[in-house]
Amino acid sequence: MIALALPAQDSGSFTPPGIDEMHLPAILPWGAHDGFSKQMLLVILSVVIIATFFILAARKQQLVPGKLQFAGEMAYGFVRNGIAKDIIGGKDFIKYVPLLFSLFFFILVNNIYGAIPVIQLPSFSHVGGAYVMAGIVYFTWIIIGIKKNGLKYFKLATVPSGVPWYILPIVVPIEIISNFLVRPVTHSLRLFATMLAGHLIVMLAGSGIEFLVMQENVLLKGASVLVLVGAVAMYMLEALIMALQAYVFTLLTAIYIEGALHADSH
């Protein structure tokens, strides 16, 4: 594909996508590379969108809910019952519903940006945002574990019960690395890598269609139709993955919180 694109690039008729495609321009006159970018604006806008929707949905509550109230209640119930209650359970789950609810819809909206024409860039396709989200979750479940079990939590989290003492020198370092070093990294990279890969595939498919359409060869022009069909299929799959990743990130957060609350039983 690159070899085919090079002659067209030299003639000035086609430019293959590069790394600049992954960086939205700054929207303020200062800080062209590290200023307030459109991506930052999209993150702020997502908060406004979520807050506005649920405020309007809960503003005039009725016994027989309207469409907006029904949608809001279904969205809340999905996180409350389908994630928090099912995973954390007991009487503890209710206090963590606001956190899980906020995480799910914040990630969902920022992911869905990638499926909206013109924008077409999920906020978490840049690793910084994914690191921040995973960092918040990381310190949250550690604090929860310490609050529930005291400093004994670190022993409970790294020394599995029922393991023979002579195996502990092998198991404990593995548990420390797995729980306190690898876990936050994989939690963030899973979100980032999925969003980045999906965005790259859609972007390359679009560039491939543009390149093929610009060719004089009829067969190449016809091939653009096949690429278009594949691009539409990938676009639909990517939209599904955007929602799925929001669910997976929130589900793992609930699992980590449950583990911190019941570390003594693991």
From Swiss-Prot:
It holds the Pfam family ATP-synt_A. CDD domains: ATP-synt_Fo_a_6. GO terms for molecular function: proton-transporting ATP synthase activity, rotational mechanism. It is found in: Cell membrane. GO terms for cellular component: plasma membrane; proton-transporting ATP synthase complex. It is a multi-pass membrane protein. The chain crosses the membrane at residues 38-58, 99-119, 126-146, 162-182, 191-211, 224-244. Keywords: ATP synthesis, Cell membrane, CF(0), Hydrogen ion transport, Ion transport, Membrane, Transmembrane, Transmembrane helix, Transport. F-type ATPases have 2 components, CF(1) - the catalytic core - and CF(0) - the membrane proton channel. CF(1) has five subunits: alpha(3), beta(3), gamma(1), delta(1), epsilon(1). CF(0) has three main subunits: a(1), b(2) and c(9-12). The alpha and beta chains form an alternating ring which encloses part of the gamma chain. CF(1) is attached to CF(0) by a central stalk formed by the gamma and epsilon chains, while a peripheral stalk is formed by the delta and b chains. Key component of the proton channel; it plays a direct role in the translocation of protons across the membrane. Belongs to the ATPase A chain family. PANTHER family: ATP SYNTHASE SUBUNIT A (PTHR11410:SF0). This is ATP synthase subunit a.
